[in-house]
Amino acid sequence: MSGELGLRKFLESNGHELIVTNSKDGEGCEADKHIVDADIVISQPFFPYYLTKERIAKAKNLKMAVTAGIGSDHVDLQAAMDNKIDVVEVTFCNSRSVAEHIVMMIVSLVRDYHNQHRIVNEGGWNIADAVQRSYDVEGMHIGTVAAGR
């Protein structure tokens, strides 16, 4: 897993070892070296460690795969079931972050940030042109449509 999520003190005071790595991609990565002895793997949905059938086969002690967020598309669920590995997520843990992200994206779209960022990176900048396509949120009626929780 990347980031300790505030778990180190709790786990180590109870006799467990917590290994944190961001080397999780490609065969032979740091995470692959530790999965052989791991009881639990904690991964994050936007920086996942993919628990493939092959990785699960090497993880003889693995009992649980935890998503520190929502989703399990980075886990081969059939392989997990075949090996009696529980796959769990921390439901609703990131609801506030998702809402903040939506507000950030709305402001980014209204201000034409993506397009202006591209123009600046290409060496251009015309303030009059930028202002013409940039708006204030004040006075707008904004609605969101959610397909999740």
Tell me the role of every PLM-derived stretch.
Residues 72-85:
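Rossmann-fold NAD(P)-binding glycine/threonine-rich loop
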Residues 83-85, 91-145:
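Phosphate-binding beta-alpha-beta segment of Rossmann-like dinucleotide-binding domains, i.e.
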Residues 54-61:
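Short, conserved loop/helix-junction motifs that constitute active-site signature segments
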Residues 27-31, 50-54, 75:
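Short acidic active-site motifs
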Residues 1, 22-26, 45-49, 69-72, ...:
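Short beta->alpha connector loops
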Residues 1-40:
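N-terminal glycine-/charge-rich "phosphate-binding" loop or analogous flexible N-terminal tail
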Residues 71-74, 89, 93, 148-149:
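Residue-level detector of alpha-helix initiation sites
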